[in-house]
Amino acid sequence: MLKRFNEEEWRSALEAGAKNLQGPVDPYLLAETIGTPVSYTKDLAGALGATDGRHIWIRAGLRPSVERSTLAHELAHILLGHTSCQDSRGELRANRLAARLLLDPDTVSRERTRCSSLSELADVLGADVDLTFWGLEACDHTP
């Protein structure tokens, strides 16, 4: 079940550095709730998504699980206050927060024992492989 937060709860979470957010949340609803427009384009210079801190661009034509994961990642950048390209540390923080937003740790832990590969787990969770990895890492597991 997806958790729903109202705008006041999101603002409170943002002020707290988004540390108290825990998924799963609907990234499309989150974008709408915090007033972040999402556009689809084929021109992202090889990237799956991008943000300037106010707007998100997603590569058109992605598989639904990759699109959801990319949107969660770009929203994480916004929640963390990122407004431009990030170094590896900034990307790491966005990856970890995106996994917390999109994945429920109890579900990740439970399904991990049932799946034989990271790819299979990603399919079950409805996320891409990268975000699933960070979800495992957040649960103190390694793939």
Describe the residue ranges of each PLM region.
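Active-site hotspot residues in diverse enzymes, especially metal/ion-binding acidic/histidine motifs
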Residues: M1-P143
